[in-house]
Amino acid sequence: MEVIEGKMPFMGYETYYRIVGRRSEKTPLVLLHGGPGSSHNYFEVLDKLAEIDNRRIIMYDQLGCGKSSIPDDHPELYTKETWVKELMALREHLALRKIHLLGQSWGGMLALIYMCDYHPVGIQSLILSSTLSSASLWSKELHRMIKYLPIEEQAAIHRAELTSNFNDPDYLKANEHFMNQHAIDMTKTWPECVMRKKCGGIVAYETAWGPNEYTPEGNLHDYEYTEKLGKIKIPTLITSGTDDLCTPYVAKTMQDHLAGSKWQLFENCGHMSFVEKTDEYVEMLRKWLDQHD
C-alpha cells in the first residue's frame, strides 16, 4: 500500500502528515486525532480502508505532538484557533478541495469548531467519532460514571480535584482504572500503532483541556457548541461505544441537534471503537463514504 509522509511549514514550525493510498476519483478522508496531543498513531488501524475502498486517507499530527513540532515553551499556541488554522493550511497545502472529515474525541470538537465558526466549503460529509458538543455536559456525565468506581477510587479523584494535586498515587491509580474502563483497556494487547509511545502532547493537553478527561479547566473549558450544531447542513454520522467516555447521552444530544444525522453505537466498546472493532468500523465507513461521495 502506498504511504506518503511529509511535513508542511506552519507558523514557523512543521506539521507532519501521512497520506495512505493512491490518488483516485473518490473524495479523500481527512482524520483529526484526539487529545489535544494524542497524535495520529492509532488511526493507522484504518489504513486498510484506503485499500478496500480505493480512497486516499490523510492523517496528521497536530502542532504540539507526534512528528510535528512541539513548541511546549510557547503553550499560548495551543488553542482551538491555532489548530483550525493548521487544518485550513493543510487543506491548502495538499490541495484538498473536497474532503470527508472524521474527528475523534478532541478531533471531533475541532471539526465542529471548524464547521460552525469557519463555514468551510468542500466538506462532503462529517463523521463525529466518540466526541462531544459541550464541555460542561461531558464533565457532568463523566462525574456520573465516576460514581460507579469503588468508593476509595471515587474519594481519590474527589480529593485530587479539591486540592489540584493530580500526582497523588491513589488518584493516578483511580484515573487509570477509569480510563481503562471507558477509553481503552491498556492492560490488553492492541495493534502496534495503538501501543506505540507518543511523542509530546502533554503540555498541549493540559493547556487546552486540563489534567484529565473530567476536569476541563484549560482554554477549552467554555467549549459549548450544542446550540450551534444547527448550522451544520451536511450529512453527519455519529459513532460511539456503549462503554465510551462519550456516553449515549452525549452522543444523543449531538444527534438531536444535527438534523438528519445518523448514530452508530458499537456494543462493548470504549472511546476507540475503530480500534476495538476495526473491521466493523471500516465497513461502516466504506458504506457511508461511498454513499456521500
From Swiss-Prot:
EC number: 3.4.11.5
Catalytic reaction equation(s): Release of N-terminal proline from a peptide
GO biological process: proteolysis
Location relative to the cell: Cell envelope
A single cellular component GO annotation: membrane
Annotated function: Releases the N-terminal proline from various substrates.
Homology family: Belongs to the peptidase S33 family.
NCBIfam families, per database record: pro_imino_pep_2, ProImpepLactob
Protein name in the entry: Proline iminopeptidase
